[in-house]
């Protein structure tokens, strides 16, 4: 069911779940005679259901995901052997057993191998695109070699886990999340239930203030009235 909904949205640009939500919310607003002129909104970080990975684990698992889509016999004997080594490797054990110097050496080695793989195989798959993204975020190329970037250069919207490419990193107050941020808007009217009129979801790095206009437009469409008062915190 979810797959068919997503395929329909990709094909037509119409979000059926959003339409269904707005119709139901609108009927409740009308039934309960809620004016919709006063609303409040707030955001909340949502963690993705992904494992937190060390830098080496992230790079290794993304490479492995790519190698599983490749025909390894197209590689040179040396490259094929190294590819099979990475496919067999448990990256969490590698990290656990390695000291800092060994890990840095492994990161440099795997970076150069990734550069070779990207040059060898054509960019015809999502796995290739994901590996290219990871390489660009984690490495720079100097004198024909892959050089690991300083951690400070890696942005919050960089790949967190290849199993959820859209998840990003954000620290908000005391909360640190790899995932998403959702913005909820609801009606506020004394003596009447609060009806949710807008639910927006973006990657975690999305700023709260950027939700404002779309959330207001969604709410006004659902309630069929113009918002006069809006309660929100300073981030908006």
Model segments located where?
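Polybasic low-complexity intrinsically disordered regions
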Residues: 1-228, 234
